[in-house]
Amino acid sequence: MERAVRVESGVLVGVVCLLLACPATATGPEVAQPEVDTTLGRVRGRQVGVKGTDRLVNVFLGIPFAQPPLGPDRFSAPHPAQPWEGVRDASTAPPMCLQDVESMNSSRFVLNGKQQIFSVSEDCLVLNVYSPAEVPAGSGRPVMVWVHGGALITGAATSYDGSALAAYGDVVVVTVQYRLGVLGFFSTGDEHAPGNQGFLDVVAALRWVQENIAPFGGDLNCVTVFGGSAGGSIISGLVLSPVAAGLFHRAITQSGVITTPGIIDSHPWPLAQKIANTLACSSSSPAEMVQCLQQKEGEELVLSKKLKNTIYPLTVDGTVFPKSPKELLKEKPFHSVPFLMGVNNHEFSWLIPRGWGLLDTMEQMSREDMLAISTPVLTSLDVPPEMMPTVIDEYLGSNSDAQAKCQAFQEFMGDVFINVPTVSFSRYLRDSGSPVFFYEFQHRPSSFAKIKPAWVKADHGAEGAFVFGGPFLMDESSRLAFPEATEEEKQLSLTMMAQWTHFARTGDPNSKALPPWPQFNQAEQYLEINPVPRAGQKFREAWMQFWSETLPSKIQQWHQKQKNRKAQEDL
């Protein structure tokens, strides 16, 4: 179980050759401007190279999968895109969905301090396709559809260059844009604005894949959805939602699931009223509220300073999500597909605290600070106020110095927001009969030395550059480009691309040329992903037991004591 599994360079070369199933050189004709016919019209893309191989990739950017959600269609479910005449240029990056670019800019600290900022527009429901150049139409390569993260308020499809993953993994990669923030997730809780429109954008993109991916060389019967952070929340939501039935066949989440606190809400009306009041709209009538917000300029909705730190969650609406995710998981009416999911070993170390403005507070963290910051999330988890200090003290232990308190705070927040929800979700899937493969990514990218303190390990999002082949991307301005990667990191990226794409191809990340990856069964084995990977068992066992057994038991005992006390008082 604890046996180290070493991966030598020669094996990695074999991994790549095995996955490509063809010579490293491009076997098809080199076409500088490839063209493909879709059901809506013809598109013209461009070809790009990838470092380390002569294989070329056809890239098509900004293909519409839905009509622009403007005017009366703002806050509505997406409508199918309209056909076009002639050949549509798909060679340049499309605008991002409307968002606060300043917030988007902070995500450059995921890897190396770089971040491409594209123009923004409400007319943004497009996707990008990356396909190996020599793959003929109808050849049936696995399809991997990526949903970006960004707390459901920022992000762009083009920030994730799929060319290296397509070339080395011999897959067709699709990256999707969806409406964000108030435009993507505003809900009145009724028919006037049911909510989840950003989620439904992703569903519409998956329908486009079913209807159009074959001419790009993809297999519509072998579609893997994958996403990171909030994108992972959407992916896990697709597994639970009846509206996504039959649109995908495997799923991957990276540091995010829909049971993360705050990501979905059953009572959207109070937030709708807050938004309306802030923007000088009626806060009593849903119909008047929606009509007023539809008439506002998009920038006014997105850039309002009073709404700057507002989170816009998914909504339990009775249709897209018939019940809460936890209820759906318990009742098991969801799509049973192979699932690969995992976390990083330092999720709440630097990137998320920086985005939340907590870095300075963390340096001089006190018990009172920790309790104050954690109160909202503990409240959402139904922890009684009287018991919150008990939870905090469980993490603090006897530590008194600021550094130890900071570390305890990071562990607590990482567990609450990512680790515990991911493990819990894994267990539900496993118990339903779905094959599950769990990982913990543990490698600190060498590029962190430029932008993050030495104590930061595998921060939130650190795995992305390895999954997308960052060391091999030609465009070094790309968010995930990693030209300074060490040889060890290049090999790690090759391995992870091989594992992710083999899972997309077969539903299992294991092959003879790859490190053994145990299935997450009752023994709860998982893979510790490092340059020298090894199998682990019972991820953070003591803390998972605390949250799944010890704390619920203590809360139940507390409620019983309160009930008994009230009964005594009533005598």
From Swiss-Prot:
Keywords associated with the record: Disulfide bond, Endoplasmic reticulum, Glycoprotein, Hydrolase, Serine esterase, Signal
Organism whose genome encodes this protein: Homo sapiens
EC number: 3.1.1.1
Glycan-bearing residues: 105
Catalytic activity: a carboxylic ester + H2O = an alcohol + a carboxylate + H(+)
Protein's UniProt name: Carboxylesterase 3
Cysteines paired by S-S bonds: 97-124, 281-292
Coiled coil: none
Domain of life of the native organism: Eukaryota
A Pfam match: COesterase
Gene Ontology CC, one term: endoplasmic reticulum lumen
Post-translational modification: N-glycosylated.
